[in-house]
Amino acid sequence: MAVFTQINDTQLAEFMADYALANVTAFKGIAAGVQNSNFIVETGDEKYILTIYEDTATGVNPDDLPYFLGLMQHLAAHGINCPTPIMQKNGNILGQLAERPAALVSFLPGRGTVTPKPQQCRAVGAALAELHLAGADFEMRRVNRQGPDNWRKLYEKSQDSADEASPGLADFIGQELQRLETAWPQGLPEGVIHADLFPDNVFFDKGEVSGLIDFYFACHDMLAYDLAIMLNAWCFEADVNFNITKARALLAGYQSVRPMSAEEIEALPILAAGAAMRFLTTRLYDWLNQPEDALVVPKNPVDYLRRLRFHRHVTSAADYGLES
Protein backbone atom coordinates (compact mmCIF):
# COMPACT_ATOMS: atom_id res chain seq x y z
CA MET A 1 0.00 0.00 0.00
CA ALA A 2 1.15 3.58 -0.63
CA VAL A 3 0.02 7.17 -1.24
CA PHE A 4 0.56 8.55 -4.74
CA THR A 5 -2.57 10.73 -4.89
CA GLN A 6 -3.17 13.19 -2.06
CA ILE A 7 -6.78 14.06 -1.17
CA ASN A 8 -8.28 16.75 1.04
CA ASP A 9 -11.17 16.77 3.50
CA THR A 10 -13.64 18.11 0.94
CA GLN A 11 -12.83 15.45 -1.66
CA LEU A 12 -13.13 12.69 0.91
CA ALA A 13 -16.42 14.04 2.28
CA GLU A 14 -17.93 14.13 -1.22
CA PHE A 15 -16.80 10.54 -1.86
CA MET A 16 -18.07 9.27 1.50
CA ALA A 17 -21.46 10.93 0.95
CA ASP A 18 -22.22 8.05 -1.44
CA TYR A 19 -22.10 5.60 1.50
CA ALA A 20 -24.62 5.08 4.28
CA LEU A 21 -21.95 5.52 6.94
CA ALA A 22 -21.29 7.90 9.81
CA ASN A 23 -19.31 11.07 9.18
CA VAL A 24 -15.55 10.80 8.81
CA THR A 25 -13.70 11.62 12.02
CA ALA A 26 -10.13 11.01 10.78
CA PHE A 27 -8.14 9.72 7.84
CA LYS A 28 -4.47 9.15 7.10
CA GLY A 29 -2.36 7.74 4.30
CA ILE A 30 -0.66 4.34 4.44
CA ALA A 31 2.97 4.64 3.39
CA ALA A 32 3.89 1.09 2.33
CA GLY A 33 3.31 -0.53 -1.07
CA VAL A 34 3.91 -0.02 -4.78
CA GLN A 35 0.68 0.19 -6.80
CA ASN A 36 -2.16 2.25 -5.36
CA SER A 37 -2.93 5.06 -2.91
CA ASN A 38 -4.34 3.79 0.37
CA PHE A 39 -5.84 5.49 3.40
CA ILE A 40 -7.29 4.48 6.75
CA VAL A 41 -10.67 6.18 7.15
CA GLU A 42 -12.35 6.39 10.56
CA THR A 43 -16.06 7.01 11.12
CA GLY A 44 -16.72 6.99 14.83
CA ASP A 45 -15.96 3.49 16.10
CA GLU A 46 -15.43 1.98 12.63
CA LYS A 47 -12.35 1.86 10.39
CA TYR A 48 -12.12 1.28 6.65
CA ILE A 49 -9.44 1.13 3.97
CA LEU A 50 -9.88 3.52 1.05
CA THR A 51 -7.98 2.60 -2.11
CA ILE A 52 -7.47 4.90 -5.09
CA TYR A 53 -6.39 2.83 -8.10
CA GLU A 54 -3.51 4.61 -9.80
CA ASP A 55 -2.91 4.96 -13.53
CA THR A 56 0.71 3.78 -13.46
CA ALA A 57 2.78 1.17 -15.26
CA THR A 58 2.42 -1.17 -12.28
CA GLY A 59 -1.13 -0.15 -11.43
CA VAL A 60 -4.26 -2.26 -11.61
CA ASN A 61 -6.06 -2.45 -14.94
CA PRO A 62 -9.44 -0.75 -14.32
CA ASP A 63 -11.13 -3.44 -16.41
CA ASP A 64 -10.06 -6.01 -13.79
CA LEU A 65 -11.51 -4.16 -10.81
CA PRO A 66 -14.98 -5.78 -11.00
CA TYR A 67 -13.26 -9.18 -10.80
CA PHE A 68 -11.02 -8.27 -7.85
CA LEU A 69 -13.75 -6.56 -5.84
CA GLY A 70 -16.31 -9.20 -6.74
CA LEU A 71 -13.91 -11.93 -5.63
CA MET A 72 -13.30 -10.26 -2.27
CA GLN A 73 -17.05 -9.89 -1.82
CA HIS A 74 -17.56 -13.57 -2.65
CA LEU A 75 -14.77 -14.85 -0.40
CA ALA A 76 -15.86 -12.70 2.54
CA ALA A 77 -19.40 -14.04 2.16
CA HIS A 78 -17.94 -17.56 2.33
CA GLY A 79 -16.10 -17.00 5.59
CA ILE A 80 -12.66 -15.94 4.37
CA ASN A 81 -11.02 -13.17 6.41
CA CYS A 82 -10.38 -10.73 3.59
CA PRO A 83 -11.37 -7.12 2.92
CA THR A 84 -15.09 -6.77 2.25
CA PRO A 85 -16.01 -4.09 -0.31
CA ILE A 86 -18.48 -1.60 1.16
CA MET A 87 -21.54 -0.99 -0.98
CA GLN A 88 -22.58 2.53 -1.92
CA LYS A 89 -26.16 3.73 -1.54
CA ASN A 90 -26.76 2.96 -5.23
CA GLY A 91 -25.50 -0.61 -4.86
CA ASN A 92 -22.10 -0.08 -6.51
CA ILE A 93 -18.84 -1.16 -4.87
CA LEU A 94 -16.61 0.93 -7.15
CA GLY A 95 -16.65 4.72 -7.16
CA GLN A 96 -14.55 7.70 -8.31
CA LEU A 97 -12.22 9.90 -6.28
CA ALA A 98 -9.70 12.44 -7.61
CA GLU A 99 -10.73 11.38 -11.13
CA ARG A 100 -9.60 7.81 -10.46
CA PRO A 101 -11.43 4.57 -9.62
CA ALA A 102 -11.72 4.10 -5.86
CA ALA A 103 -13.21 1.61 -3.42
CA LEU A 104 -13.86 1.40 0.30
CA VAL A 105 -13.30 -1.94 2.06
CA SER A 106 -13.48 -3.21 5.61
CA PHE A 107 -10.52 -2.78 7.95
CA LEU A 108 -8.88 -6.00 9.16
CA PRO A 109 -7.13 -6.36 12.53
CA GLY A 110 -3.61 -7.71 12.90
CA ARG A 111 -0.33 -7.16 11.14
CA GLY A 112 1.99 -8.92 8.70
CA THR A 113 5.25 -10.65 9.53
CA VAL A 114 8.77 -10.30 8.19
CA THR A 115 10.11 -13.55 9.68
CA PRO A 116 7.28 -16.09 9.76
CA LYS A 117 7.39 -18.87 12.34
CA PRO A 118 6.52 -22.51 11.50
CA GLN A 119 3.16 -22.28 13.28
CA GLN A 120 2.30 -19.22 11.18
CA CYS A 121 3.28 -21.15 8.05
CA ARG A 122 0.93 -23.95 9.03
CA ALA A 123 -1.89 -21.50 9.71
CA VAL A 124 -1.48 -19.69 6.40
CA GLY A 125 -1.26 -22.99 4.52
CA ALA A 126 -4.67 -23.91 5.92
CA ALA A 127 -5.98 -20.43 5.11
CA LEU A 128 -4.87 -20.77 1.48
CA ALA A 129 -6.69 -24.10 1.17
CA GLU A 130 -9.82 -22.53 2.65
CA LEU A 131 -9.57 -19.74 0.08
CA HIS A 132 -9.33 -22.30 -2.73
CA LEU A 133 -12.42 -24.12 -1.51
CA ALA A 134 -14.37 -20.90 -1.00
CA GLY A 135 -13.52 -19.72 -4.51
CA ALA A 136 -14.69 -22.92 -6.19
CA ASP A 137 -18.11 -21.51 -7.15
CA PHE A 138 -16.99 -17.97 -8.01
CA GLU A 139 -18.34 -17.47 -11.52
CA MET A 140 -16.08 -14.73 -12.88
CA ARG A 141 -12.81 -15.68 -14.57
CA ARG A 142 -9.53 -13.85 -15.01
CA VAL A 143 -6.60 -15.28 -16.97
CA ASN A 144 -3.25 -15.44 -15.18
CA ARG A 145 -1.26 -12.74 -16.96
CA GLN A 146 1.86 -13.63 -14.96
CA GLY A 147 2.15 -17.15 -16.39
CA PRO A 148 4.79 -18.86 -18.56
CA ASP A 149 4.00 -16.78 -21.66
CA ASN A 150 4.77 -13.61 -19.71
CA TRP A 151 8.03 -15.03 -18.32
CA ARG A 152 9.23 -15.56 -21.88
CA LYS A 153 8.21 -12.04 -22.94
CA LEU A 154 9.97 -10.42 -19.99
CA TYR A 155 13.07 -12.52 -20.59
CA GLU A 156 13.25 -11.44 -24.23
CA LYS A 157 12.99 -7.79 -23.15
CA SER A 158 15.71 -8.24 -20.51
CA GLN A 159 18.02 -10.75 -22.18
CA ASP A 160 20.62 -8.32 -23.54
CA SER A 161 21.21 -6.70 -20.13
CA ALA A 162 20.45 -9.61 -17.78
CA ASP A 163 24.10 -10.29 -16.99
CA GLU A 164 24.30 -6.86 -15.34
CA ALA A 165 22.35 -8.42 -12.47
CA SER A 166 24.42 -11.61 -12.32
CA PRO A 167 27.07 -13.00 -14.71
CA GLY A 168 25.64 -15.73 -16.93
CA LEU A 169 22.05 -14.94 -15.97
CA ALA A 170 20.77 -14.57 -19.54
CA ASP A 171 21.91 -18.06 -20.53
CA PHE A 172 20.66 -19.57 -17.29
CA ILE A 173 17.17 -18.12 -17.65
CA GLY A 174 17.01 -19.14 -21.30
CA GLN A 175 17.87 -22.75 -20.50
CA GLU A 176 15.57 -22.91 -17.49
CA LEU A 177 12.66 -21.39 -19.42
CA GLN A 178 12.98 -24.10 -22.02
CA ARG A 179 12.91 -26.77 -19.30
CA LEU A 180 9.88 -25.24 -17.60
CA GLU A 181 7.92 -24.72 -20.81
CA THR A 182 8.50 -28.36 -21.78
CA ALA A 183 7.57 -29.79 -18.39
CA TRP A 184 4.84 -27.34 -17.33
CA PRO A 185 1.92 -29.40 -15.93
CA GLN A 186 -1.43 -29.73 -17.65
CA GLY A 187 -4.74 -30.96 -16.30
CA LEU A 188 -4.22 -30.24 -12.61
CA PRO A 189 -7.15 -28.95 -10.51
CA GLU A 190 -7.78 -25.27 -11.19
CA GLY A 191 -9.73 -22.48 -9.59
CA VAL A 192 -9.32 -19.08 -7.97
CA ILE A 193 -5.76 -18.45 -6.78
CA HIS A 194 -4.42 -15.47 -4.85
CA ALA A 195 -1.11 -15.61 -6.77
CA ASP A 196 0.73 -13.17 -4.47
CA LEU A 197 0.28 -14.40 -0.90
CA PHE A 198 3.55 -13.12 0.54
CA PRO A 199 3.99 -12.63 4.31
CA ASP A 200 3.16 -8.92 4.04
CA ASN A 201 -0.21 -9.86 2.52
CA VAL A 202 -1.27 -11.93 5.53
CA PHE A 203 -2.31 -10.45 8.87
CA PHE A 204 -1.97 -12.31 12.16
CA ASP A 205 -3.73 -11.45 15.39
CA LYS A 206 -3.11 -13.39 18.61
CA GLY A 207 -1.41 -16.14 16.65
CA GLU A 208 -4.28 -16.65 14.20
CA VAL A 209 -4.65 -15.59 10.57
CA SER A 210 -6.84 -12.50 10.80
CA GLY A 211 -6.73 -11.33 7.20
CA LEU A 212 -5.65 -12.07 3.63
CA ILE A 213 -5.16 -8.90 1.59
CA ASP A 214 -3.98 -7.57 -1.79
CA PHE A 215 -5.97 -9.66 -4.27
CA TYR A 216 -4.79 -7.67 -7.30
CA PHE A 217 -2.95 -10.61 -8.90
CA ALA A 218 -5.78 -13.07 -8.25
CA CYS A 219 -6.82 -15.16 -11.24
CA HIS A 220 -7.87 -18.62 -12.42
CA ASP A 221 -5.03 -21.15 -12.51
CA MET A 222 -3.71 -24.37 -10.99
CA LEU A 223 -4.38 -24.45 -7.26
CA ALA A 224 -1.06 -26.14 -6.50
CA TYR A 225 0.75 -23.27 -8.23
CA ASP A 226 -0.57 -20.94 -5.53
CA LEU A 227 1.01 -23.20 -2.92
CA ALA A 228 4.25 -23.26 -4.92
CA ILE A 229 4.35 -19.45 -4.81
CA MET A 230 4.07 -19.64 -1.04
CA LEU A 231 6.92 -22.14 -0.77
CA ASN A 232 9.09 -19.46 -2.35
CA ALA A 233 7.67 -16.58 -0.34
CA TRP A 234 7.46 -18.15 3.13
CA CYS A 235 10.07 -20.91 3.34
CA PHE A 236 13.38 -19.24 2.47
CA GLU A 237 15.37 -17.29 5.04
CA ALA A 238 16.93 -13.86 4.51
CA ASP A 239 20.14 -15.57 3.36
CA VAL A 240 17.99 -17.52 0.83
CA ASN A 241 18.57 -20.85 2.55
CA PHE A 242 15.55 -23.14 2.38
CA ASN A 243 13.82 -23.83 5.71
CA ILE A 244 12.29 -27.29 5.46
CA THR A 245 10.63 -26.93 8.88
CA LYS A 246 8.58 -24.00 7.61
CA ALA A 247 7.81 -25.79 4.34
CA ARG A 248 6.69 -28.92 6.17
CA ALA A 249 4.35 -26.81 8.30
CA LEU A 250 2.98 -24.88 5.31
CA LEU A 251 2.23 -28.05 3.35
CA ALA A 252 0.74 -29.83 6.37
CA GLY A 253 -1.58 -26.90 6.99
CA TYR A 254 -2.75 -26.91 3.39
CA GLN A 255 -3.20 -30.70 3.31
CA SER A 256 -5.27 -30.60 6.52
CA VAL A 257 -7.97 -28.65 4.67
CA ARG A 258 -7.58 -29.64 1.01
CA PRO A 259 -5.49 -32.78 0.42
CA MET A 260 -3.61 -32.55 -2.87
CA SER A 261 -3.93 -35.19 -5.55
CA ALA A 262 -0.99 -37.46 -6.41
CA GLU A 263 -0.58 -35.51 -9.65
CA GLU A 264 -0.37 -32.19 -7.80
CA ILE A 265 2.21 -33.57 -5.39
CA GLU A 266 4.31 -34.91 -8.26
CA ALA A 267 4.16 -31.53 -10.02
CA LEU A 268 5.12 -29.46 -6.98
CA PRO A 269 8.86 -29.16 -7.80
CA ILE A 270 8.26 -27.86 -11.34
CA LEU A 271 5.52 -25.53 -10.09
CA ALA A 272 7.85 -24.14 -7.41
CA ALA A 273 10.56 -23.59 -10.01
CA GLY A 274 8.01 -21.84 -12.21
CA ALA A 275 6.95 -19.60 -9.34
CA ALA A 276 10.58 -18.66 -8.78
CA MET A 277 10.94 -17.93 -12.51
CA ARG A 278 7.92 -15.64 -12.39
CA PHE A 279 9.46 -13.43 -9.72
CA LEU A 280 12.95 -13.66 -11.19
CA THR A 281 11.80 -12.37 -14.59
CA THR A 282 9.48 -9.68 -13.23
CA ARG A 283 12.06 -8.39 -10.76
CA LEU A 284 14.83 -8.52 -13.36
CA TYR A 285 12.75 -6.48 -15.79
CA ASP A 286 11.84 -3.94 -13.10
CA TRP A 287 15.47 -3.75 -11.93
CA LEU A 288 16.71 -3.06 -15.46
CA ASN A 289 13.93 -0.58 -16.29
CA GLN A 290 13.61 1.55 -13.17
CA PRO A 291 12.25 5.03 -14.02
CA GLU A 292 14.38 7.92 -12.79
CA ASP A 293 11.45 9.30 -10.80
CA ALA A 294 10.44 5.92 -9.32
CA LEU A 295 8.93 6.12 -5.83
CA VAL A 296 9.79 2.49 -5.07
CA VAL A 297 13.20 0.80 -5.29
CA PRO A 298 13.00 -2.43 -7.36
CA LYS A 299 13.65 -5.67 -5.49
CA ASN A 300 16.85 -7.59 -6.16
CA PRO A 301 16.19 -10.35 -8.73
CA VAL A 302 19.16 -12.41 -7.51
CA ASP A 303 17.18 -13.63 -4.47
CA TYR A 304 14.89 -15.52 -6.85
CA LEU A 305 17.79 -16.74 -8.96
CA ARG A 306 19.04 -18.52 -5.84
CA ARG A 307 15.60 -19.96 -5.17
CA LEU A 308 15.34 -21.22 -8.73
CA ARG A 309 18.73 -22.92 -8.47
CA PHE A 310 17.51 -24.67 -5.33
CA HIS A 311 14.34 -25.94 -7.01
CA ARG A 312 16.34 -27.34 -9.94
CA HIS A 313 17.85 -29.92 -7.59
CA VAL A 314 14.59 -30.94 -5.92
CA THR A 315 13.61 -34.46 -6.98
CA SER A 316 10.23 -34.80 -5.25
CA ALA A 317 7.82 -33.03 -2.92
CA ALA A 318 9.46 -34.93 -0.06
CA ASP A 319 12.40 -32.54 -0.44
CA TYR A 320 10.00 -29.78 0.63
CA GLY A 321 9.03 -31.76 3.73
CA LEU A 322 5.73 -33.13 2.43
CA GLU A 323 4.86 -36.11 4.58
CA SER A 324 3.10 -39.04 2.96
Residues of each region from the PLM?
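An alpha-helical support segment within catalytic cores of ATP-dependent transferases
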Residues: 7-19, 139-141, 153-195, 205
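Conserved N-terminal boundary motif of the eukaryotic protein kinase catalytic domain
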Residues: 21-28
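Active-site acidic catalytic loop and adjacent metal/ATP-binding pocket
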Residues: 31-42, 49-50, 85, 178-225
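ATP-binding pocket architecture of kinase catalytic cores
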Residues: 43-139
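A cross-family kinase active-site recognition segment
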Residues: 114-167, 188-190, 295-301
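ATP/Mg2+ or Mg2+-diphosphate-binding catalytic cores
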Residues: 159, 279-324
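Active-site activation/catalytic loop segments of kinase-like enzymes and analogous catalytic loops
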Residues: 224-259, 273-291
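All-alpha amphipathic helical-bundle segments outside canonical DNA-binding/catalytic cores
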Residues: 260-272
